[in-house]
Amino acid sequence: MARKTAAEAKETRQRIIDAALEVFVAQGVPDATLDQIARKAGVTRGAVYWHFNGKLEVLQAVLASRQHPLELDFTPDLGIERSWEAVVVAMLDAVHSPQSKQFSEILIYQGLDESGLIHNRMVQASDRFLQYIR
């Protein structure tokens, strides 16, 4: 079998991340399996392991690939009004975009994953936002 090009490997990796997002939403992070993710992505389990060392690393990639509205970069020179506007626009996007909805579901409903990744990410985002608006 011919080796994949870098572009094909990147595309496969992204398909796995997108599939993982759907599987994590449908099954919950703790109950999702790499087999389910591989099937959803249309790849072998070996392909998943070629790109990731395990489910935790897949979850990290899913989290790294998306941004929650409270994770926006807030800078003092932006001003409080513009910052709130950015949050509202991002929240509206999260409500209307299917992938953003799925990502938000993971962050909200799966926040107590065994690794603590999701919970820690949301706490950090909330803390940054609260520091900015004070």
From Swiss-Prot:
The record, for Pfam families, names:
TetR_N
Per the UniProt record, the lineage of the source organism begins with: Bacteria, Pseudomonadati, Pseudomonadota, Gammaproteobacteria, Pseudomonadales
Q: Which purpose does this protein serve, as stated in its record?
A: Unknown, does not seem to be involved in regulation of the ttgGHI or ttgVW operons.
Q: Which residues bind DNA?
A: 33-52
PROSITE patterns given in the database record: HTH_TETR_1, HTH_TETR_2
Under the heading Gene3D superfamilies, the entry gives: Tetracycline Repressor, domain 2
The induction annotation reads: The ttgVW operon is induced by toluene and styrene, but not by the antibiotics carbenicillin, chloramphenicol, nalidixic acid, tetracycline or gentamicin.
Kindly list the residue ranges recorded as spanning the membrane. Answer: none
This chain's protein is named: Uncharacterized HTH-type transcriptional regulator TtgW
Does Transcription count among this protein's keywords?
Answer: yes
Record-annotated HTH tetR-type domain positions: 10-70
Q: Keywords on this record?
A: DNA-binding, Plasmid, Transcription, Transcription regulation
State one molecular function term (GO): transcription cis-regulatory region binding
